[in-house]
Amino acid sequence: MKSLQALFGGTFDPVHYGHLKPVETLANLIGLSRVIIMPNNVPPHRPQPEASSAQRKYMLELAIDDKPLFTLDERELQRNAPSYTAQTLKAWREEQGPEAPLAFIIGQDSLLNFPTWHDYDTILDNTHLIVCRRPGYPLEMTQAQHQQWLEQHLTHTPDDLHQLPAGKIYLAETPWLNISATLIRERLEKGESCDDLLPENVLNYINQQGLYR
């Protein structure tokens, strides 16, 4: 049996401990062998990132340099069109074959607006969803049909993620760090310290490049 691997997408503008630490804890909790970080080039749901694709890629390389759990996948950075998760996960499934257990990691805030994503209802055909719980967010979807969809696919057993190739949603109890890329950009713009919010080598690069000023 192939080991469970997961994809973790985002703009990472910049990457910070709020991205990395919960996923490292998650990997230990459920036995993830590999987490593939996939930065977006043109995110459909957000404004264009402030840092360039090359700068965000380099910051990620710095952040995961000493973390063998993580690898970097650049395919979405090489697209000039919006990156739709459903398309990316379909391509990943085709590469990995029908039996490999695959998962996509999202935050609880993303789960609540998941039905607005492009072709959201095809995503579980190709992967599991692992949701990092966040305090203060409700556990129910806003519409009954979407709540029914959640309950239909929900599992409380991490073993299901290893034994099945796709189709399950698992709510993981991961630590919540009150850190966001927006907060970091705002603090940098004001000249405030971000020493405890992101890796030192990433912060040094940001300062060298004069980013987010």
Swiss-Prot record:
Pathway: Cofactor biosynthesis; NAD(+) biosynthesis; deamido-NAD(+) from nicotinate D-ribonucleotide: step 1/1. GO terms for molecular function: ATP binding; nicotinate-nucleotide adenylyltransferase activity. The keyword Ion transport does not apply. Its EC number is 2.7.7.18. The keyword 4Fe-4S does not apply. Signal peptide: none annotated. It comes from the Bacteria. Pfam families: CTP_transf_like. Coiled coil: none annotated. Keywords: ATP-binding, NAD, Nucleotide-binding, Nucleotidyltransferase, Pyridine nucleotide biosynthesis, Transferase. It catalyses: nicotinate beta-D-ribonucleotide + ATP + H(+) = deamido-NAD(+) + diphosphate. GO terms for biological process: NAD biosynthetic process. CDD domains: NMNAT (cd02165). Belongs to the NadD family. NCBIfam families: cyt_tran_rel, nicotinate (nicotinamide) nucleotide adenylyltransferase, PRK00071.1-1, PRK00071.1-3. Catalyzes the reversible adenylation of nicotinate mononucleotide (NaMN) to nicotinic acid adenine dinucleotide (NaAD). This is Probable nicotinate-nucleotide adenylyltransferase.
